Swiss-Prot record:
Belongs to the RimP family. Keywords: Cytoplasm, Ribosome biogenesis. NCBIfam families: PRK14639.1. It comes from the Bacteria. Required for maturation of 30S ribosomal subunits. It comes from Campylobacter jejuni subsp. jejuni serotype O:2 (strain ATCC 700819 / NCTC 11168). GO terms for cellular component: cytosol. Pfam families: DUF150_C, RimP_N. It is found in: Cytoplasm. One of its GO terms (biological process) is translation. This is Ribosome maturation factor RimP.
Length: 140
């Protein structure tokens, strides 16, 4: 099953997916984006496309709930493409060495991400594989 093609059919672009457990329930979440933003009708349309397909070819074992959503303003960055699409945005990063910092994404080149540290304004380049966790954030 090609989630990217199915999302495109609904006029959306696939961002990410995850399987989580909340209150003892398995939830399979699909995050999508669209120029101008994703609305409730977009999510419902994709859910209607996916539900009959998932009834035949389940993406997860056992019972689950399907959720279609926008990744939001403060979203997880788990692929190099996510960083490339987030140039100019603020990000909180935890490295594999458990170092934590906040920075602005300046550039992405292959597997390397150039960041400007928000504390000292120093520019640094980090390899994507050295990042354990990253999430965009908004300063209010």
């Amino acid at each position: 099953m090609n989630l990217e093609a199915l999302c495109k059919e609904a006029g959306l672009s696939f961002y990410d997916d995850e399987l989580v457990s909340e209150n003892g329930r398995k939830i399979y979440r699909i995050y999508v984006q669209k120029e101008g933003g994703v609305n409730l009708d977009d999510c419902a349309r994709l859910s209607e496309i996916l539900s009959p397909i998932f009834d035949v070819e389940s993406p997860v074992n056992g019972e689950y709930f399907l959720e279609v959503s926008s990744p939001g303003l403060e979203r997880k960055l788990s692929k190099i493409e996510h960083f490339a699409k987030s140039i100019g945005e603020l990000v909180k990063i935890t490295t594999n060495e458990k170092e934590k910092f906040e920075a602005k994404i300046i550039a992405v080149d292959d597997e390397n991400i150039t960041l400007e540290n928000l504390e000292n304004k120093e520019k640094t380049t980090i390899n994507f594989n050295d990042i354990k966790k990253a999430r965009t954030f908004v300063e209010w």
